[in-house]
């Protein structure tokens, strides 16, 4: 998703990102039901590679920038830390990424609300996915928000985010 809502997005990066996202949406829940299915695992490995191709065209943006203090201070694994904010960021960036979101929804036969729910469901039962579940004290959210501004990452987001915006996202991610 970060390659889609990135100021450096281009048709190639967007196509790679949409391909990776659609494959993850198609295979994520299936893997939870059958962890030993090598075909599904292979599909997800290909998705990760294609997502990497998208990033190689754009670099990363707000989700990665916000992930760094989560990993450094609380040991949240990189993949979780960099994906935990995707839903609120998708909503913030939604108006500027309508066409790619429509393609993702159409390719997966989902409404926008179903897309959000599918994304939310993928990590359920697999990894903790709220900041509270990771043991982050709520009074640390302002500090995390202040530390979330990595030059060359946060400023790639198509919507310019303020510290208050990031604090709002972190509060949204705190608990369900």
Residue ranges and their predicted role:
Residues 11-22, 60, 80, 95, ...:
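Alpha-helix N-cap/helix-start motif at coil-to-helix transitions, marked by capping-box chemistry
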Residues 1-2, 18-29, 42-49, 63, ...:
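Predominant activation on well-ordered alpha-helical scaffold segments within soluble catalytic domains
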Residues 4-9, 58-59, 92-99, 176:
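Short helix-capping/linker segments at secondary-structure and domain boundaries
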Residues 1-58, 157-158, 164:
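Carboxylate- and glycine-rich phosphate/diphosphate-binding segment that chelates Mg2+/Mn2+
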